[in-house]
Amino acid sequence: MSAAAFLNDFHHVATIGATPNNGVDRQAATADDARTRNWFAEWVRRAGWELRVDGIGNMFGLLEWTPGAPFVVIGSHLDSQPLGGRFDGAYGVIAAMHAARSIDLEVAESGMAPRFNLAVVNWFNEEGGRFAPSIMGSSVFAGLLDREKMLAVTDLQGVSVREALDGIGYLGTAEGPELAGYAEIHIEQGRILEREGINIGLVDSSWYTQKLDIEVLGEQSHTGATAMADRHDALVAASKIILMVHDVTKDFAEEALVSSVGQLTLEPNSPIVVARRVHLVADLRSGDPEIVTAARAALLEQIDALAREHDIKVNVKDFDIRPIRRFPKAGLELSAKVAGKLGLSSRRIQTMAGHDSVAMNTVAPSVMLFIPSVDGVSHCEREFTTDDDMVTGLAMLTGVARELVSGALAGQERPTAELATAVAGAAGAMAGGAA
């Protein structure tokens, strides 16, 4: 394993779509995403591996040592948030590429093929910054989302996933590999590892997540000529909903629930017109599904009262509901053993953020690893992780992948999902006015 070669590749990729303050902007299926994909494809070809692109744009570099055997897949994603960080996702893909190359050399030198083959993946649209929902490519691969429905999803400009992928030349037709297991390494995007001085986080579970699609419908009118008493301002109502989403966390123990509104659009978006429509997306997350259920119920009640107060209509729909997923105990034990052999400190940790590994954990034994994030900052240009921590994580991923291709987690059962009782299967809700 060459740390210098890995770091050279990582810092090169960070120049693609680079932003002024050391971040990147490589939203899914944009020109800069295409440039990064081209780099990945060329790297895979130079390594002598098979390149496949499936029907949702996922890219695979396959190393087949044992014909007919399934594949352990390792990787992450190369797309980013708008004005995002250069470490999120890209680190996991590039680390996987170099881990796979090291194992490939070991296999060639030993002349002994392992039980399983190995593949490196760049998942499509993990971030969800351009197309919703996030974690799209891996969820389609895992059968959690319908491919045709996802290809029809459009961005804010009305461009569909199908059109965008076709436009950059990455609407593939190949099938992904048969899966034996999955591993992913990622920056923590939190402060626990840095604060405790721990090298590696062993992810044991994901938080429960759900989003609310909220449409506020008021009445368009003149900002100067319309009397204040006669206004039905959708933006004023939406601003109060944003505060409700923020403040609902105060109803629960500190940090038991996180919530925010991260996207907002309004119509007609003119400086001299009272807004007739505002669309926003609220994000609720907790380690306890029932807390999300309670927060959702409280918000719906408050939104209903607000709609009546302002004499407007508010439509609220549930979407992107993700249950708690627990990672296999055997994978956690395996990872702790690898860390110990490498002389690395480790601890179990939850992931509050969504990752491709959470989707993959529904179809195959999966391992999720974290390395420290400086100040816990992520999804912004200030995101940072040291070179030393990245190289340490590369060694860890290589060790785990080596064990997985040898069959370490073969025969492990898939974990079950933990849904909130009141939200599971919910189709949506309506609030206020004539709704």
Locate the predicted segments by residue.
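Catalytic-core environment of secreted peptidases
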Residues: A47, G55, M59-Y91, H222
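Zn-dependent metallopeptidase/amidohydrolase metal-coordination segment
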Residues: F6, H12, I16-T19, G75-S76, ...
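A short beta-alpha structural unit
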Residues: A28-A29, S260-N269, V281-D283, G287-D288, ...
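Alpha-helical metal-binding/catalytic segments enriched in His/Glu/Asp
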Residues: I74, L83-E127, Q210-V216, H222, ...
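A non-catalytic alpha/beta surface segment that caps or lines the substrate-entry region
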Residues: A18-E64, I349
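N-terminal capping segment at the start of a domain
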Residues: M1-T30, F124, R322, V377
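Midchain, well-structured core segments that form catalytic/ion-binding scaffolds
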Residues: N125-E126, A132-S134, S138-E290
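His/Asp/Glu-rich mid-to-C-terminal helical/loop segments that flank catalytic regions of hydrolases
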Residues: S206, H222, T226-D251, R296-E301, ...
